[in-house]
Amino acid sequence: MVKAKIAVNGYGTIGKRVADAVQAQDDMEIIGVSKTKPNYEAAVAHQKGYDLFAPASNSGAFEKAGIPLAGTIEEMVEKADLVVDCTPGGIGEANKPMYEKAGVKAIWQGGEDHELAGFSFNAASNYEGALGRDLVRVVSCNTTGLCRVIYPIDRELGVKKVRVTLARRATDPNDIKKGPINAIVPDPIKLPSHHGPDIKSVLPHINITTAALKIPTTLMHLHTVNMEVNTDCTAEDINRIFSSQSRIRFMSQGINSTAEIIELARDMGRPRNDMWENCIWPESITVHEREFYFFQAIHQESIVVPETVDAIRAMMELESDGAKSIQKTNKAIGL
Amino acid sequence: MVKAKIAVNGYGTIGKRVADAVQAQDDMEIIGVSKTKPNYEAAVAHQKGYDLFAPASNSGAFEKAGIPLAGTIEEMVEKADLVVDCTPGGIGEANKPMYEKAGVKAIWQGGEDHELAGFSFNAASNYEGALGRDLVRVVSCNTTGLCRVIYPIDRELGVKKVRVTLARRATDPNDIKKGPINAIVPDPIKLPSHHGPDIKSVLPHINITTAALKIPTTLMHLHTVNMEVNTDCTAEDINRIFSSQSRIRFMSQGINSTAEIIELARDMGRPRNDMWENCIWPESITVHEREFYFFQAIHQESIVVPETVDAIRAMMELESDGAKSIQKTNKAIGL
């Protein structure tokens, strides 16, 4: 079988994880990754055997740093069937003409607007809608984490209303510039946060309100989720529905915080201590009549990675069944 | 007028603030404060002119440290009309026999159970119920902050349901032992947190569910509050109701986090940068039909201080009208 040729434009927090996850599949391969500067991430990409591409204007800096380049970003794009754009939020939009000119398919991350791609993706919620598409946006970590729980509950019980408070990690572990380091920041102060509307880009009929806080931690986000449903249910019903989802993982055995979740991922030998699943505490599932609550933690660096692999598979029509793609992706990365 | 004689048993985070706030009133005075160890707080209490009392068994340590004592804790209690017990949560209960033996009135903090005093106090919600009582519990910072907003909304619009997510500061600024320093801790994992039931100790008929997270910050708690009410209303209505409360302060003018609230308190010359008021962002007040949301920040070290002064005034029957006591307390401390 000829593998689908995938390029990753922007080998940063998400891009490097997407590259490794794609490379682990048997129906797609990485033909190149791009980096603007010859930093430690570029050096490791080269050591791992990825062909490295950079803007033509920066080739001198790579040469000086002793990191060999395989060509320019335009040349990388020309070689690919599909480009996963993992450049910082807002930058990806400017790359659209380049992808169109080269006639390649493109995936953007949740930092870009829905309108740029015209289709926002979550594997469990709308895989089939992405089949054969040229342009897809994989929604952000928090939106992915919420779609993964809202979709199966809506299918089985009918969702009347969702209310979420998101405690967001201030920044990623490798960032030494952003804060806060000792404050709570309602972000935004004016409700709702963008997450509620963003869920609607995948699940348009869901009535949802979200409020977000930025807090001094780097490891994971944490959601307090409240859902009203249209059907009588028990905590056991919710538990059963979540248990049926391969990308939901229950937390117990002394895991009482995001710190212990990450320690679990480290102990499991997960690459970069990634936790691709929603981490839900089953003990927190509490039902009052047709309304329930629970806590879930979301690993911002990695949760969209398996979704991106599934998006590639749908767009390249390598698999028409979403459930089969999810299973295949999971197995290949060790989820 | 003879001033009511008040002792503070436990001159720590809350106790030292209560002592200063009582001393600022014209109808009550501090006749002594107690400390178990001769640390820097004891030294400052002495420098400020408070008579200092300690357990008889620790008098040698105070002598050695050069901090003069006025007597034992039992002797302090004997001199008082009313003791404010600010010992750590759970310790206060053991002091009840001592207060009963001395025939003094007693106030406990929210760390003790409701049953210990049989009456849980919030000035705006139930001042009159404390008139002449011998034993009162002033509810905790988070419960106080919630009573202050729930009571006036319930009176004007009727509260159908309250849902709160509390992002709790991990510990106070002077604590060097507790964490987390980089994690989010659902605390407790099993819902509801104790805050919901605790609100009912003041406002028994309120339907409320609370979920709490412990996060790496020391400055303030932050609540995401959702309320369903029985009456049609607008954001302006909510704004007007909150504006009528002297212990609610609106945040604007570039105050976007708890860090900036504390900076405001420092700039205002507040003692120990205390922010006695609920800090609400009016921009966050969002109404959907008969349901609204808002953010409020709560200064855990100081919010119960004016409430404690009002509780004293009610129990000593120095003022029969709660609104007048609140006004008098506020004016004396500069709120």
UniProtKB/Swiss-Prot annotation, chains A, B:
Pfam families: DapB_N (PF01113), Gp_dh_C (PF02800). Its EC number is 1.2.1.59. Pathway: Carbohydrate degradation; glycolysis; pyruvate from D-glyceraldehyde 3-phosphate: step 1/5. NAD(+) binds at T13, I14, G111, R169, Q300. One of its GO terms (cellular component) is cytoplasm. InterPro entries: DapB_N, GlycerAld/Erythrose_P_DH, GlycerAld_3-P_DH_AS, GlycerAld_3-P_DH_cat, GlycerAld_3-P_DH_NAD(P)-bd, Glyceraldehyde-3-P_DH_2_arc, NAD(P)-bd_dom_sf. It is found in: Cytoplasm. It catalyses: D-glyceraldehyde 3-phosphate + phosphate + NADP(+) = (2R)-3-phospho-glyceroyl phosphate + NADPH + H(+); D-glyceraldehyde 3-phosphate + phosphate + NAD(+) = (2R)-3-phospho-glyceroyl phosphate + NADH + H(+). GO terms for biological process: glycolytic process; lysine biosynthetic process via diaminopimelate. The keyword NADP applies. D-glyceraldehyde 3-phosphate binds at S140, C141, N142, T171, H195, G196. The active site is at C141. Transmembrane segments: none annotated. Homotetramer. This is Glyceraldehyde-3-phosphate dehydrogenase. It comes from Methanosarcina mazei (strain ATCC BAA-159 / DSM 3647 / Goe1 / Go1 / JCM 11833 / OCM 88).
